[in-house]
Amino acid sequence: MTKVRTKISLKIGANSRIPAQIASFNGLTSDKEHIAIIFGKADECSSSPIVRIHSECLTGDVFHSSRCDCGEQLDEAIELMEKEGGIIIYLRQEGRGIGLYNKIDAYKLQSEGMDTYQANNQLGFEDDLRDFTEAGQMLAALNIRKLQLLTNNPLKVKALREYGITVDKVISTSTFIKDDNESYLRTKAKNAGHAIRFPF
């Protein structure tokens, strides 16, 4: 059974000004060191907190790469939860589960004309290797049984519902279009059903 291992308080975000808690876990089904970032008392209330399941993206989250919108989505979640409370489930699933080096290899193939899924397939991987079951385990360990999910990805909604967690509402993330990521976003919408709103 998954249980909270350690929970600490710290400040995060720009200028380290946003109070939050970081929780680690024992008993996850993989050896990945996933964490939960808790804002306010989202894990102590009986209502339906806002939750974002966010897969690690070093190039986007840390270096704000122009190739994706991951960093902007993470920043948006932090800003929203600073005001409303909530929980970010941060999963160590770099490159939709293929790892950082393989993702960089995939980027090279994309530069040669492949889309994000074709590149993964060329490297011998499926379109998306992520499993969101552990997100359900972590939320259950935090006593979260119902929530509002901040996502454009229907697979995350499906995974939580299959785990027995009630998704009261799906909140779409904003669309962050940059010169280098429009094709990537349109491919996710077309191939994986992401509910991305394009202005044109």
Curated annotation (Swiss-Prot):
GO MF term list: GTP binding; GTP cyclohydrolase II activity; zinc ion binding
EC numbers, comma separated: 3.5.4.25
Listed pathway(s): Cofactor biosynthesis; riboflavin biosynthesis; 5-amino-6-(D-ribitylamino)uracil from GTP: step 1/4
Manner of cofactor binding, per the entry note: Binds 1 zinc ion per subunit.
Disulfide bonds: none
GO biological process: riboflavin biosynthetic process
Annotated residues for binding of GTP: R52, I53, H54, S55, E56, Q73, E94, G95, R96, T116, T151, K156
Cofactor: Zn(2+)
Annotated positions binding Zn(2+): C57, C68, C70
SUPFAM superfamilies associated with the record: RibA-like
Presence of keyword Metal-binding: yes
Keywords: GTP-binding, Hydrolase, Metal-binding, Nucleotide-binding, Riboflavin biosynthesis, Zinc
Residue positions of the active site: D128, R130
One term under GO cellular component: cytosol
Reported function: Catalyzes the conversion of GTP to 2,5-diamino-6-ribosylamino-4(3H)-pyrimidinone 5'-phosphate (DARP), formate and pyrophosphate.
Family per record: Belongs to the GTP cyclohydrolase II family.
Designated name of the protein: GTP cyclohydrolase-2
Organism annotation: Psychromonas ingrahamii (strain DSM 17664 / CCUG 51855 / 37)
